[in-house]
Amino acid sequence: MACAEQDKLGQAFEDAFEVLRQHSTGDFQYSSDYKNYLAFINHRSHIRGNSNSYGVQPAEEPIYNWRTVINSATDLYFEGNIHQSLQNIPENQLVQPALLQQKGGKGRKKLRLFEYLHESLCNPEMASCIQWIDQTKGIFQFVSKNKEKLAQLWGKRKGNRKTMTYQKMARALRNYGRTGEIIKIRRKLTYQFSEAILQRLSAPYFLEKEIFYSQYVQPDQGYLSLNNWNANYNYTYANYHELSHPDC
């Protein structure tokens, strides 16, 4: 990569974060990795600018892929805003959302039943086992003839050796009723997610991230188009605040 192109890349990287910072609702905190990256870009620009005076030929420049840079940047932006929106929820109602779980490794959190149920509700192939009654209110119902099948699939998903039954699963649902994540509705096999849980499970993180990313990076494009960024950023930012919870 030419020196001029590398300089433009470093400047564009800083500009991207400046835009995110200006449009965020609170202080936008850079991680140490991004601070180190900015320092690295600036340092290399300084060395290149003075290398000719020492008779040193600049080394071959590594190619930085904007997919990785922008993908990480939007992770920080959207996760930061979700974190801020959760600060107003009472502590006893907070449940770590699946979208913020660690991706693999020993620190990965186990999938919880209410997460699995919401996932199944969002899966058309599971409509014979569980269905929405009122999605906006988080009300759902188990299909009587296939409720055992859903329970068995849940047991397999957990890695249980013994077959999971609906009776055992219903016991866990009653425990949720005591803690407030899911409550029983006065209707057969019908339950309701709490508002706080429904908001976390329905958070439009991945949808918005895809919109944010696709506005200025084409499918086969590994670099950033600043013209596309300027033309589409305001549109994308407005969509983030206007879109309601997407349909599953």
From Swiss-Prot:
Output the Gene Ontology terms for molecular function: DNA-binding transcription factor activity, RNA polymerase II-specific; sequence-specific DNA binding
**Tell me, which GO biological process terms does this entry list?**
cell differentiation; regulation of transcription by RNA polymerase II
Membrane-spanning regions, if any?
none
- Gene3D superfamilies membership: Winged helix-like DNA-binding domain superfamily/Winged helix DNA-binding domain
Q: Which PROSITE patterns match?
A: ETS_DOMAIN_2, ETS_DOMAIN_3
One of the record's GO cellular component terms:
nucleus
Residues the UniProt record assigns to the DNA-binding region sit at 111-194
Entry keywords, A to Z: DNA-binding, Nucleus, Transcription, Transcription regulation
The listed locations are:
Nucleus
Q: What does this protein do?
A: Controls the development of red pulp macrophages required for red blood cells recycling and iron homeostasis. Transcription factor that binds to the PU-box, a purine-rich DNA sequence (5'-GAGGA[AT]-3') that can act as a lymphoid-specific enhancer. Regulates VCAM1 gene expression.
Q: Which family does it belong to?
A: Belongs to the ETS family.
> What interactions and quaternary structure are annotated?
Binds DNA as a monomer.
Q: What is this protein called?
A: Transcription factor Spi-C
